[in-house]
Amino acid sequence: IKGLLKPGDHVLVSSLEHNAVMRPLCQLASQDIHYTMIPAETDGTTHPESIEALIRPETKAVIMLHASNVCGTILPIREIGEICRRHHLFFAVDTAQSAGSVDIDMQECNIDFLAFTGHKGLLGPQGIGGFLISEALDHELTPLIAGGTGSQSDSLLMPDYLPDKYESGTMNLPGIIGLHAALTYLEEAGIPAIHQKKMELTGYFLKKIQEIPQAHVAGKQTIRDRLAVVSLDFPEYDNAEIAFSLEQDYGIMTRVGLHCAPMAHQTLHTMPHGTIRFAFSHFNTTEEIDCCIDGFRELFSV
């Protein structure tokens, strides 16, 4: 973001963005760089046709996540990519939540920049990630970090070729090796099979949580157009206390709060308290979900 945008530029972002996008954009506001938020429904549904009216002469790019890390809603990047193509806009997509779960075709979706993290659906260690970049955007992007690369060491200038121009300093070799092992596992197990299992568990959880009247699902109520992430809000209770009890009393790990995505919570009407987020793995079971539901029953029977 900081290597692409110049004073006077304007970008469009979704209303579900993570602070990984929003904080750089807000920092750039002091440099006369501005953004407009694409409206979404309260379940995160974003309509591509609402974008064209927001495009200005100075609009340079559309930046958005592929799927919400809060509620799992999948955004229509194929249709939005086509709009970017027609209007000659760069299209940057954050796939932190979707990489390793669903197929993404950069060319078909007209994606110029695709960022991913290794520690979620790709099952790698924390602290490793990367990006893919189109040739057109590579010519526009200014590297922000300079340093040793182990290549062209006789030059005081950074190499001008990929990937060295963007990779300064000692690489995170343990992270790279860990991610490589994870990718090998994913290839052997099969991403479609893993995704199917996760969505079956998500559907089961969405069905069973209806038995808990105190719980409100923030986001889509079914498995359509979503990933295996479910956020719950308990309007009459303290979400943090419930999450603490789930961990201490039942051994159930969740993530509670705003998930580094306050704009998403504004969209979902769960600000300022946030939600309790459940993210299902193919290693989970329906029996574990049943234990969670039983835990909720016990908590609310006191």
Regions found by a protein language model. Name each.
Residues 1-302:
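Pyridoxal 5′-phosphate
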